[in-house]
Amino acid sequence: MKNERLIGAWRKILQMKPENPTIEICPGITRRTVANGETMYQMLATLAAGSRMPEHSHSQEQIVHILEGKMRLIVDGVPHELSNGDSFYLASNVPHGVETLSATRVLDTFSPPRKDYLAIDEKVRQEVL
């Protein structure tokens, strides 16, 4: 019974992924929802070389894992250079920004979920229909 529940959840994630749109967050930076649940949200972000995410903050905690590329994370005015395989954690409401040093792909996980992003996904899906 326990395995059936896990398999059902896994199927839901696999079925959801293909319908998620790619959304531009800001020039040169796109995101695509990978999965979400009641307490977490995960997305794949693609950042063009030289792109910049201005300083911002959000109420969610965030964990970022760099899949490929190189970026400069700026927290409290202090730059941190990160590359393939690096991960970092940001607490709620911590101002941060990013500058890419090469084309970069990251896996972002937020808790609680980014309901704002999910609402945009749904709006885009409805516009396509």
Question: Over which residues does each language-model region extend?
Answer:
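Short, conserved beta-strand element in jelly-roll/cupin
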Residues: T46-A48, H58-L73
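Structural motif
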Residues: I63, K70-R72, P79, P95, ...
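Conserved short histidine dyad/triad with adjacent acidic residue
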Residues: P27, M43-S57
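Ligand-binding loop in jelly-roll beta-barrel domains
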Residues: S92-D116
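Short acidic-glycine-tyrosine-enriched beta hairpin
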Residues: G77-S92
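A cytosolic small-molecule/anion-sensing beta-strand core signal
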Residues: L67-E68, S83, S102
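A short, N-terminal "cap"/entry segment at the start of jelly-roll beta-barrel domains
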Residues: M1-T39, A119-L129
